[in-house]
Design a protein with these regions (language model features):
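Conserved N-terminal beta-strand and adjoining loop/helix that marks the start
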Residues: 1-22, 91
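A generic structural micro-feature
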Residues: 3-7, 35, 80-86
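Active-site-adjacent beta-strand/loop module that shapes the phosphate/pyrophosphate-binding cleft
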Residues: 17, 75-98, 132, 136
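Hydrophobic pocket-lining residues within nucleotide cofactor-binding pockets
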Residues: 43, 74, 94, 113-116
C-alpha cells in the first residue's frame, strides 16, 4: 500500500455580537507569535470538527459558544507555514463578558469590521473574517 501525506485539520471560530464586533486572540506561540488570529486549533483524533470548534473557543477565550453557520473550508496548501492545513470556519455567538485569554492565547480583544485593515492578522484569517462578516450581515 502506498503512503499518502495527509493534511492537518483545524477549526476556526468567528465569535460575534449583535453589533458585528468580533473576538480575536493574540497568539502566544509561533507561527505568527503576537499576531491577532481567530480562536481555533487542531481537530483531535476521534473528535468532530464542530466539537473541536466549540472546545478551541472555550480553551482560548473561556467563552462557551453556540455555532451558528459553517462559513467555508479553506485549504490552500501554503496557508499555514507549518504545513498543509485545512480549516473549517464557523460563525458563533457567545458572551463577550466571559472572555479571558487562555491556552495558546496571550491576549484577547474585541474588534469591529472598521478596524480590520489596521490589525496584523495571522494566517489567512483576514480573508476568513471578511467571509464571516458577509454571511453574518446577510443573515441579519
Amino acid at each position: 500500500m502506498a503512503y499518502h501525506k495527509i493534511p492537518s485539520l483545524t477549526a476556526d471560530i468567528f465569535i460575534f455580537d449583535d453589533n458585528l464586533n468580533f473576538i480575536l486572540i493574540k497568539r502566544r506561540n509561533d507561527p505568527f507569535k503576537n499576531c491577532w488570529a481567530l480562536p481555533g486549533g487542531f481537530v483531535e483524533y476521534g473528535e468532530s470538527v464542530e466539537n473541536a470548534a466549540i472546545r478551541e473557543a472555550k480553551e482560548e477565550t473561556s467563552i462557551d459558544v453556540e455555532l451558528i453557520d459553517l462559513v467555508n473550508v479553506y485549504s490552500e496548501p501554503d496557508r499555514d507555514p507549518r504545513g498543509h492545513t485545512i480549516t473549517v470556519a464557523y460563525t458563533a455567538k457567545g458572551n463577550f463578558n466571559d472572555g479571558k485569554a487562555e491556552d495558546d492565547a496571550c491576549d484577547i480583544a474585541i474588534f469591529s469590521a472598521e478596524k480590520l485593515d489596521e490589525i496584523k492578522i495571522a494566517f489567512d484569517h483576514k480573508k476568513i473574517i471578511k467571509d464571516c462578516l458577509k454571511i453574518v450581515k446577510k443573515n441579519l
